[in-house]
Structures are given as C-alpha cells and as structure tokens.
Amino acid sequence: LTHSEVDELADTIVSLREKFKLTILLVEHHMSMVMKISDQVVAMEFGRKIAEGTPSQIQSDENVVRAYLGGDI
C-alpha cells in the first residue's frame, strides 16, 4: 500500500470501530498505523508473543526494540 492508502485504511478502520462499536483484530506490519489507531498491541517475534500493552508501552519495551530494531533503548 502507498502512504495515502495506509492513511485511508487507518481512517476506515477507526470509522468502522467508532460507528459500530467494534473490537477489531488487526494483523499489520505498518507500525506507525498500528501505533496510531490501536488501544492495545501484541508484539510477536517468530510466532511468539514478546510484549503486550498500550502503544507507548510497546514502543519502549526492551524485547520489542531488540526484536524489531536490533538494539537497546
């Protein structure tokens, strides 16, 4: 997806969630979108859960930083 398509998808997901009071399970690799629209995030590495929490908790989790960026905070 292009950047504008990712933004449009995020807006659509948020709109549907709010309009119909839905819980949405999103499996996605566009992390900026995930962090922008999610209340809770589960981070996985090789099929194993390595962290769960709010977007801000996930962004500062040492296991997530190591797995996704290859370094320490």
Range-by-range predicted roles:
Residues L1-I73:
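Glycine-rich phosphate-binding loops of nucleotide-dependent enzymes
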